[in-house]
Structure formats: C-alpha cells, structure tokens
C-alpha cells in the first residue's frame, strides 16, 4: 500500500514468501546470516520512501528447525546504531550454527532474546538472555562472519548463568546412554570437535551453580579461548562439596588424533558434603584431596587414555567414607580401588580411614603402583601394588592386609593371606590368592608390569610391619615413582 507515487510517500508492505533457496532473500535483510531451504517468511514494513533507514517492521523466518523474529529497523541495522529486537528458537545449537555458517555442537532446545545491531562485518547481541534446556545465560555476544580474506568466523562473549548443566549440551543418545550401566569404564564415543577447527572463540563465563556429570559446583569461573584450531581452558575454578577445584585443558583440533593435555585438582573435599542424596550412616567426616594430570592423543576418551602419560593420586585425611556413595566422575578409577582394596570393609557401610594414599604413575596407558596404594583403617592396615591397563581396563593389583593389634581381628588369621584385585575398571573383582602364587607373580612382574619396574620385590609386602607410618612411607615411594613429576598433595601423617 502506497500513499502516492511521490518520493516522499509513505508505504505499508506486507509480504509472505516460501522459497526452496532463500539465500538471496535473507541476505537482503540480514547479510551476515544464511539459512538452508526450504524457508517460509513473513515481512511487514512501514515507512517513507525517502527515509528508508527509519522504516520499521517485523521479519518472521522459519527454516529447518530454526525460528527467528526480528523487530525494528530492518533496513538500517548497523547504521547510526540502529537496533533490532531478536527472538530465536531452535531445537539444537547445531542448527543455529548452520544459521551463521559455522559449526556448533548439538544441544537441548535453545531460546534467545536480545537486542541486535550491526558491527562491521558482523553483529552484536546486547542484553542477551537465552536458555539451553535447563541452563540459562545472559550477557553480550559478538559474531564476526567469515570475511573475504579467509579469516574464520569469530565469537566474543561475556556470559553469566544462574544454573548450567552439561547434559543440555549433549545429544539425546548421549544423555540416554549415560543412564545405562557402562560395559566399559572409558567411553569410545568419537569426539566431535569440528567447531574448534571452524571458529575462533573468546568466552568469559561465570555460573552460580553448575552440574557436569556427578560434579555439583558453585561459583564456576572460566575463560575459554579457541584460536587457529586450538582450545585452551585456562584454570577453570569452582567450589565443589567444600573443596576448591582447578581444571586446565589444552586441545589441538588441527590434527587427528586430537592432542590433549588435562589437569584436574580437588583440594579439601569434605566427605560430609560429598553425597548426592544417598542414605548412609552419619556423621561423615574427613577430607579427600585428588590430583590427575594426563597427556595423550585420541579421537575418543578411550583412545586418549590408552596411550596417556601422567599420574593420578588420591589422599585421604581421617575420613568416614560411605561404601555406596555416588562417585565423582574423574576420580572413579581411584574410588574403584578404594572400594576393593580393603577386603574387611564389606560388613560395614562406611570406610573408617585414618589416612590413605592411592597413587598411580601413568606411562603409555599403563597405570603403575609401586606400593603406593596404602590405607590405615580402624581394623586393618592395607598395602597394595600393581597395574591398571587403561587400554584394556584390566586390573592386576596385589593386596596385603595386616590386622591392627587390639581391634578384634586375629593377626594370626591374616598371616600369609594376600588378595588379588582383578577384573576390569567397570567390574573389579577381589579374590583370595595363595602367598606362593601371588608372590611369584609380583616377583616376576611379567604378567602385571611391563614397564621395567624392578622394585616390586616380594620383601616390600613384609615391610607392612615396619614402625613407620604406612601412609607417609607410601607418599615417599610415590614421590620416587613420579621421578621428579610435580606432586603438590601430601598425606596427613598419623
């Protein structure tokens, strides 16, 4: 509808379009975005012919699982700070990635509202508020599209959340499989990280609460930088069950397999705050420290750990730990050992541990313990050594318990008794073994240890009766086993 044919006439435009190839249409209104067909669009626009930059209207687009509504200065975004209000809905971030000609991961449904303005070769969304499943975000996002010089699309974002849940950024199949008992401890699901190679990203992020697997965190802070195909998460910090968590991650996606450097530290985990709804005997006391460092290559978690180098250690300080407590994901290997290293704990719903150290050095996917698995419990002292093949997940650990005097267990009844912790990480099994068979296996080391460690002499088991503190001695052996590797955690002495 036109007021007249004069250049100053007002107009009112209503337009509906269905298109199999909508690039030219969308490019006319929003040149920084592309949409795959088929597309349905509705446009309403009002203004004057000689003042087209002041024309205002509404654009509704529906295409391939993405719905976008733009309100405001449709013809002049980017000029004189003209802005558009935006509302966007899609069933996955991956579809949103196609909207901006970039690769983004799968996710739960997405809803975004904000104010958009043009900025050079890109757009800026101010006062952005968006939800991904149960996770909420607010802040500002800048998107710079692929330019003529071949530079990658870039995203700069400053975001905060009241709540974040990692499962909102997983596929339905991944979320469903997480609820099933795993046949294998380490996932062989292929890592899909094309978005790291395809985009440059700088993200500053804070969350009041965050859930990642079994991790329930508070006050999460991180800076993520993706540049030239490399992802760097520089010291993620959060509070978790009273402990301070620090995580760093470097991942090179420019090559296959991916090159990964990972560090995880949890200091002062309070056992009383560890549980997530389990009914166990109270009170629970004590603290646990955990540290894991890994370097490896692979296209799945299984491939990465199969040839990884590094170490993993847990230090326990005077703790009552429930045997059936739900376990934090990165520490489950250590807790699998803790669950089975004390054969006399089955009758009790909690571990009464005065001190403990569970330490492994990891070389080429083999986790070795040179008598660096030690527990001093109420009834018994335990020393163990052996190996875990992270590629096959097979466990071969020798366990020697010794009853503590005056605590109701006959020292004679334990004389010469050894146990073998076998099976796999997903299904560990403890079996009693004769001293002759077990000591022969430990002495030869051929079946259990292939790294050339010769310190597993059978006499070390007999040192359990030494006057020294079993935890302190195990800590000294772990320092030696690491051979100069940085180890910042120390066990409580006595």
Write out the residue ranges for each language-model feature.
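Outer-membrane beta-barrel proteins
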Residues: 24-26, 95-97, 137, 166-170, ...
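Flexible beta-edge/linker motif
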Residues: 149-169, 302-304
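Extended amphipathic ligand-handling, pore-lining, and cofactor/metal-binding catalytic surfaces
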Residues: 314, 437-438
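Solvent-exposed beta-strand/coil patches in large extracellular/periplasmic or lumenal scaffold regions
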Residues: 1, 28-31, 39-73, 91, ...
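Short hydrophobic membrane-inserting alpha-helices and related fusion/pore-forming segments
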Residues: 440-463
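Short "repeat-start/strand-capping" segments in structured domains, especially the N-termini
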Residues: 9-12, 81, 143-144, 152-155, ...
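Short proline/glycine-enriched turn/loop segments at secondary-structure junctions
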Residues: 4-5, 32, 147-148, 281, ...
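Soluble, non-transmembrane catalytic domains of enzymes that act on hydrophobic metabolites at membranes
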Residues: 399-403, 412-420
């Amino acid at each position: 509808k036109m007021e007249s044919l004069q250049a100053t006439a007002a107009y009112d435009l209503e337009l509906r379009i269905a298109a199999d190839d909508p690039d030219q249409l969308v490019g006319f209104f929003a040149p920084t975005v592309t949409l795959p067909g088929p597309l349905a669009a509705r446009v309403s626009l009002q203004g004057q012919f000689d003042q087209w930059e002041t024309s205002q209207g509404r654009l509704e687009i529906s295409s391939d699982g993405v719905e976008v509504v733009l309100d405001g200065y449709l013809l002049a975004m980017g000029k004189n700070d003209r802005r558009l209000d935006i509302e966007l809905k899609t069933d996955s971030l991956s579809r949103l990635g196609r909207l901006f000609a970039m690769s983004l991961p799968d996710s739960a449904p997405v809803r975004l509202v904000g104010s958009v303005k043009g900025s050079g070769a890109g757009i800026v969304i101010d006062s952005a508020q968006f939800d991904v499943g149960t996770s909420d975000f607010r802040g500002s996002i800048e998107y710079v599209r692929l330019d003529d010089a071949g530079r990658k699309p870039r995203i700069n974002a400053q975001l905060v959340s009241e709540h974040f849940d990692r499962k909102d950024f997983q596929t339905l199949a991944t979320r469903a499989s997480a609820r099933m008992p795993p046949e294998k401890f380490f996932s062989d699901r292929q890592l899909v990280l094309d978005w790291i190679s395809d985009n440059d990203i700088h993200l500053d992020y804070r969350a009041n609460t965050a859930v990642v697997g079994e991790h329930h965190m508070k006050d999460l802070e991180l800076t993520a930088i993706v540049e030239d195909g490399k992802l760097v998460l520089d010291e993620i910090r959060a509070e978790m069950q009273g402990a301070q968590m620090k995580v760093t991650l470097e991942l090179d996606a420019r090559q296959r397999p991916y090159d990964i450097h990972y560090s995880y530290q949890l200091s002062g985990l309070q056992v009383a705050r560890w549980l997530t709804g389990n009914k166990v005997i109270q009170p629970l006391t004590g603290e646990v420290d955990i540290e894991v460092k890994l370097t490896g290559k692979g296209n799945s978690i299984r491939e990465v750990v199969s040839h990884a180098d590094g170490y993993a250690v847990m230090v326990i300080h005077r703790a009552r730990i429930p045997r059936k407590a739900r376990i934090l994901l990165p520490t489950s290997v250590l807790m699998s050992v803790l669950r089975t290293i004390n054969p006399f704990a089955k009758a009790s719903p909690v571990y009464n541990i005065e001190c403990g150290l569970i330490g492994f050095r990891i070389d080429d996917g083999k986790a070795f313990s040179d008598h660096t698995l030690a527990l001093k419990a109420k009834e018994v002292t335990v020393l163990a050594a052996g190996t875990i093949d992270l590629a096959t997940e097979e466990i071969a650990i020798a366990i020697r318990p010794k009853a503590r005097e005056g605590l109701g267990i006959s020292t004679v009844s334990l004389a010469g008794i050894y146990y073998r912790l076998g099976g796999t990480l997903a299904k560990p099994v403890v079996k009693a073994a004769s001293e002759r068979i077990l000591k022969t296996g430990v002495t030869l080391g051929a079946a259990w240890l292939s790294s050339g460690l010769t310190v597993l002499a059978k006499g070390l088991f007999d040192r359990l009766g030494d006057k020294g503190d079993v935890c302190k001695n195990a800590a000294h052996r772990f320092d030696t086993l690491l051979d100069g590797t940085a180890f910042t955690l120390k066990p409580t002495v006595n």
